[in-house]
């Protein structure tokens, strides 16, 4: 089964694998400090607060919030310890590393990036995810500082239909002039129109 979109995967994969798209369960499986609405944080700090499941533009609705014991997040959301470091996305084909890119997040937002750039770096399939790669051909994993934050039963389509090494997302509510030497790649998704590709 090869999927391009998370909604296709969610509707077709066996229910026993749907935990991958439940970011709270994924975080617990990975041993992170986290909890749903109704469970408060153990210490005052900054945490990532995001929807438990969101199949389109999966960081939509995510934010960094300072929480204290006794604070509650909205129903349907969960809190998780905040990670810092490089934001990396990796495609694996039956566990073998394929397309790997580094994201440059927008300052103050978790759901937008200013650019993505292909990189040449060896990143083994995370052991904590077991043998998922033996069941699904393509698995895309996003990490921050080496910590897995999202898993998708699909490949990263953003780098599939062109030969570019760097892509600049273009958003509906922003004007991004065409960078020198770039070409347009139409790839609409939610509030994204596509990419300038170099």
Model-derived features with residue positions:
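Active-site nucleotide/adenylate-binding loops and adjacent lid/helix of ATP-dependent enzymes
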Residues: 2-129, 170-174
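ATP-dependent carboxylate activation and anion-phosphoryl transfer catalytic cores
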Residues: 56-58, 110-198
């Amino acid at each position: 089964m090869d999927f391009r979109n998370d909604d296709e995967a969610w509707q077709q994969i066996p229910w026993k694998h749907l935990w991958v798209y439940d970011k709270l369960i994924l975080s617990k499986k990975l041993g992170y400090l986290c909890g749903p609405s109704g469970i408060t944080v153990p210490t005052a700090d900054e945490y990532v607060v995001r929807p438990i499941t969101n199949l389109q533009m999966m960081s939509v609705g995510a934010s960094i919030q300072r929480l204290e014991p006794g604070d509650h997040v909205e129903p349907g959301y969960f809190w998780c310890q905040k990670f810092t470091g490089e934001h990396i996305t990796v495609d694996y084909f039956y566990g073998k590393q394929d397309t790997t890119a580094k994201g440059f997040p927008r300052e103050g937002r978790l759901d937008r990036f200013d650019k993505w750039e292909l990189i040449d770096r060896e990143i083994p399939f995370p052991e904590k995810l077991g043998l998922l790669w033996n069941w699904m051909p393509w698995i895309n994993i996003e990490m921050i500082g080496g910590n897995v934050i999202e898993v998708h039963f699909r490949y990263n389509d953003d780098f599939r239909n062109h030969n570019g090494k760097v892509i600049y997302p273009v958003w509906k509510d922003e004007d991004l002039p065409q960078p020198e030497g770039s070409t347009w790649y139409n790839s609409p998704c939610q509030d994204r129109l596509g990419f300038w590709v170099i």
